[in-house]
């Protein structure tokens, strides 16, 4: 018993990222040598993801309401420049995916049609879903994790509470601090969660099923890596005018790794919020930009939609000119921004992009089925890019406007 405090002190001294890497390796080894036991510990991963998903809507609602209610007059926030960066990043990702697909054309072995999913009818349907999400019932929005609706209600209440008594605003601030503390406790269990997620995933499917789609995966993941390590740093350099890579690697390490294994931008919101706090960013800014980014900053989704669509086009022998490729980039960027408003995310928006080339819905749904097969890697890499970019662009904008703690700025 006397060794327990020493063990806990050692765990507290060890960085969370190091603990997550240990959990990752342990999960892979367990799945390799004891697949039966690995399936059992998958429960740890499911519990961790569920805990993050449970706390994220409440965190966003309370934090945004508190930030706006307690906002001091004359204190600037920089949401608009961050939204511009989100749009620029998503459009750049679509363009990178088009270029990668032209340089490394890919063909698909189409599988049986995925009949249990229904894609949206068009871009109008996606926008319609987003608009109705804004005016959703607040209780239903919290229960279903509708972050567009949560943001709308939190912003409205935040502005309304600016006229409340000081004691009311302090209560909201205390509630925000309490929820933040709960989030920190949940995140401390990330190593166990990653251990369970890796062990369960490898024990269930392994990577044998992915070998047949190795070239497609290389193009997908390669485009995402190029976006994360080349394009995003260029955008950040344009903002902060100095070496962007320390900040880029911090965001990939602290946010991207967790997002890769949770495979949920919503579940990674608490992780991103805590990282923004450690980076010394302005709370009024990141409390809005991070949940907003989880909804509209979808560079990874734009890459997935574009690469799989052009793979289908190449498989069917359809010729693509430059003008159509540019149009596809724009369509993929718009579709990607609506990915969070569609059940199934980016994969179910592929038929929209395929319709640009006259590909029938039956064939497009076969492409979606291929996407589900490679989803273990595709969805993980996509979420890691999406979520880490939320923090990256928020931090870049704050640094560019001098809205960051100086000590934190020296660390990045």
Swiss-Prot record:
Its membrane topology is listed as: Multi-pass membrane protein
Q: What is its main location?
A: membrane
Q: Name one GO biological process term.
A: serine transport
> Mind telling me which InterPro entries this protein's record contains?
Na-dicarboxylate_symporter, Na:dicarbo_symporter_sf, Ser_Thr_transp_SstT
Query: Which top-rank group of organisms is this from?
Result: Bacteria
Instruction: List the GO cellular component terms.
Output: plasma membrane
The entry lists its GO molecular-function terms as: neutral L-amino acid:sodium symporter activity
Keyword field: Amino-acid transport, Cell inner membrane, Cell membrane, Membrane, Symport, Transmembrane, Transmembrane helix, Transport
Which reactions is this enzyme annotated as catalysing?
A: L-serine(in) + Na(+)(in) = L-serine(out) + Na(+)(out); L-threonine(in) + Na(+)(in) = L-threonine(out) + Na(+)(out)
What compartments host this protein? Cell inner membrane
Which spans are transmembrane here?
16-36, 44-64, 82-102, 115-135, 141-161, 179-199, 217-237, 298-318, 330-350, 357-377
Is Cell inner membrane one of the keywords? yes
Cross-referenced Gene3D superfamilies, in alphabetical order?
Answer: Sodium:dicarboxylate symporter (1.10.3860.10)
Is Repeat one of the keywords UniProt gives this record? no
Task: Give the similarity note.
Answer: Belongs to the dicarboxylate/amino acid:cation symporter (DAACS) (TC 2.A.23) family.
Stated role: Involved in the import of serine and threonine into the cell, with the concomitant import of sodium (symport system).
* NCBIfam families per record: PRK13628.1
Q: Please identify the protein, giving its name as recorded.
A: Serine/threonine transporter SstT
GN (gene name): sstT
């Amino acid at each position: 018993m006397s060794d327990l405090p020493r063990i806990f002190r050692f765990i507290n001294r060890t960085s969370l990222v190091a603990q997550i890497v240990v959990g990752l390796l342990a999960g892979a080894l367990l799945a390799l040598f004891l697949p039966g036991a690995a399936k059992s510990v998958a429960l740890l991963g499911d519990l961790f993801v569920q805990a993050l998903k449970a706390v994220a809507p409440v965190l966003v609602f309370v934090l945004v309401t508190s930030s706006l209610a307690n906002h001091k007059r004359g204190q600037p926030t920089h949401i608009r420049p961050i939204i511009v960066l989100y749009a620029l990043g998503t459009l750049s990702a679509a363009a990178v995916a088009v270029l990668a697909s032209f340089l490394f054309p890919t063909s698909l072995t189409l599988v049986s049609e995925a009949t249990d999913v229904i894609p949206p009818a068009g871009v109008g349907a996606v926008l319609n879903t987003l608009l109705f999400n804004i005016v959703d019932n607040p209780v239903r929005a919290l229960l279903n994790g509708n972050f567009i609706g949560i943001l709308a209600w939190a912003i409205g209440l935040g502005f309304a509470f600016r006229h409340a008594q000081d004691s009311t605003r302090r209560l909201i601030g205390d509630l925000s601090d309490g929820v933040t503390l709960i989030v920190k406790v949940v995140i401390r269990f990330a190593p166990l969660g990653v251990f369970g997620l890796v062990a369960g995933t490898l024990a269930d499917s392994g990577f044998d099923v992915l070998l047949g789609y190795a070239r497609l995966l290389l193009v997908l993941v390669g485009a995402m890596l190029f976006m994360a390590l080349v394009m995003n740093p260029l955008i950040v350099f344009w903002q902060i005018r100095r070496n962007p890579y320390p900040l880029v690697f911090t965001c990939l390490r602290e946010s991207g790794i967790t997002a890769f294994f949770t495979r949920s931008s919503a579940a990674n919101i608490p992780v991103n919020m805590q990282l923004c706090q450690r980076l010394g960013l302005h709370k009024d800014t990141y409390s809005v930009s991070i949940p907003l980014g989880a909804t509209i900053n979808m560079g990874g989704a734009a890459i997935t939609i574009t690469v799989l669509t052009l793979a289908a086009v190449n498989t069917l022998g359809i010729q693509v000119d430059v003008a159509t490729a540019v149009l596809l980039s724009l369509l993929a960027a718009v579709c990607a921004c609506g990915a969070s408003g569609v059940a199934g995310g980016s994969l179910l928006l592929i038929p929209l992009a395929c319709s640009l080339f006259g590909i029938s819905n039956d064939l497009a749904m076969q492409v979606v089925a291929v996407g589900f097969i490679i989803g273990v890697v595709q969805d993980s890499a996509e979420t890691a890019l999406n979520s880490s970019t939320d923090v990256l662009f928020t931090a870049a904008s704050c640094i560019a406007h001098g809205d960051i703690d100086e000590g934190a700025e020296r660390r990045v």
